Amino acid sequence: RDLVRSRGLGDVYKRQGVHVTDPSVKAIIDIGGQDVKGIAIDTDGTVLNFAMNDKCAAGTGRFFESMARAFEMSLDEFSNLSLTAKNVIPITAQCAVFAESEVISLVGEGKPMEEIAAGIQLSVAKRCFVMAKKAGAADSVTLTGGCAKNEGLKKAIEKVLKINVVDLPTDPQLMGALGAAEYARQKGSNV
């Protein structure tokens, strides 16, 4: 019951899930539907630093969903589109609403969709850069949340952060559940 009542521990569980999955990971960028978090952990999985951006939807899963709609394609198709870009068209708007308007204008002008998509990925990667640096990411980082499955974003983060994005062997959306199960196991819970 205590485990079920422990609301607000999702980030703790994600951190624990990542640590159980790959103890070498020292930095996490968690990109969910509504916020972006940077989490630095030490060798035993203890949180050293935490940073969060929940003030703007730009840079979140919801933002990617609206961009995919603007491109009239699935989220999976959009996530991979930027990988074929030869150039990047920068997205200058910092607000999700203005960014969507900017993207629609660029599409209307006939700009290459893959280059616009690369600009969107780069824009989000820059927001992730801020969270990762605030949290203290240095050598490598892993991604959790649904956006961790976005290959274009992973490549953009590697480019912006100039560090390796470590792929986890387990679904990155399951890190919270895995961490909660590990927490229950450590506490001797029969959950």
Model-predicted regions and their roles:
Residues V25-T46:
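Gly/Thr-rich phosphate-binding beta-strand-loop-beta motif of the actin/hexokinase/Hsp70
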Residues D11, I157-L178:
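Conserved phosphate-binding/catalytic loops in two-lobed NTP-binding clefts
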